[in-house]
């Protein structure tokens, strides 16, 4: 056994011992993090969150982020999706969040509400044109009540879609997170009218016990009614 292996096992043992000192809910989260290969892979590749791998999978499946693309990341903190957009060839990436985001080389990060009227002027200056991709991995603070959480995330998705309608270029793509439930019918009907293709996907990086899925709409048609 090498010194590196021994050291790695010792560090894991220390983290496990530390996790056992927390209350059960925190302990469960810490243990899950320790055993999650995507958490380890994110650290290894320098991504700020395991969610980065969800966008990688979605992009590989649907070809969302072309070279030179202009991308807007809504609810961007801590920045994993913004990092992926840059890595996959986007030329201009804007991350927007109410929370602070540590700087990311090559990206413009804005602390604020993407619904503010002032955002439109700022984006036009930064992007130099309409966005090719508007993406949102936003999620509400969950209550544990399935129906309530579903309605809350639908509210966020609708706000993101309204933003996309204002800022997407013809042929552009929209990606948003949802929780499984029955309230997305009207949104899907609208998307099918305004985009050439609308699909659902649950990336492998999504946890098995998670109700999340991603709605991916491509081929934006701004003049469709």
Curated annotation (Swiss-Prot):
Entry-linked InterPro entries: RNA_methyltr_RlmE, RNA_MeTrfase_FtsJ_dom, rRNA-MeTfrase_E, SAM-dependent_MTases_sf
Residues passing through the membrane, by range: none
MF (Gene Ontology): rRNA (uridine-2'-O-)-methyltransferase activity
Coiled-coil region: none
Main location: cytoplasm
Catalytic activity: uridine(2552) in 23S rRNA + S-adenosyl-L-methionine = 2'-O-methyluridine(2552) in 23S rRNA + S-adenosyl-L-homocysteine + H(+)
One GO CC term on file: cytoplasm
Enzyme Commission (EC) number: 2.1.1.166
Subcellular location: Cytoplasm
Keywords on record: Cytoplasm, Methyltransferase, rRNA processing, S-adenosyl-L-methionine, Transferase
Active site, UniProt feature: 177
Superkingdom of this protein's organism: Bacteria
Family: Belongs to the class I-like SAM-binding methyltransferase superfamily. RNA methyltransferase RlmE family.
Name this polypeptide is given: Ribosomal RNA large subunit methyltransferase E
Organism: Acidiphilium cryptum (strain JF-5)
Name of the coding gene: rlmE
């Amino acid at each position: 056994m090498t010194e590196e292996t021994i050291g790695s096992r010792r560090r894991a043992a220390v983290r496990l011992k530390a996790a056992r000192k927390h209350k059960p809910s925190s302990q469960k989260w810490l243990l899950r993090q320790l055993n999650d290969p995507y958490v380890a892979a994110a650290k290894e590749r320098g991504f700020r969150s395991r969610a980065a791998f969800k966008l990688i999978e979605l992009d590989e499946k649907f070809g969302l982020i072309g070279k030179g693309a202009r991308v807007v990341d809504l609810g961007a903190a801590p920045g994993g999706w913004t990092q992926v957009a840059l890595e996959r060839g986007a030329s201009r990436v804007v991350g927007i969040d109410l929370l602070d985001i540590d700087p990311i080389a090559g990206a413009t990060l804005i602390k604020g509400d993407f619904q503010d009227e002032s955002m439109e002027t700022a984006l036009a200056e930064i992007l130099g044109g309409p966005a090719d991709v508007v993406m949102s991995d936003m999620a509400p603070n969950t209550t544990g009540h399935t129906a309530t959480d579903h309605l809350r995330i639908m509210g966020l998705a609708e706000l993101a879609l309204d933003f996309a309608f204002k800022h997407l270029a013809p042929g552009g793509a929209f990606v948003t997170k949802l929780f499984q439930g029955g309230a997305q019918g009207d949104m899907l009907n609208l998307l099918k009218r305004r985009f050439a293709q609308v699909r659902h996907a649950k990336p492998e990086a999504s946890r098995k016990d998670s109700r999340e899925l991603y709605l991916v709409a491509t081929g934006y048609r701004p003049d469709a009614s």
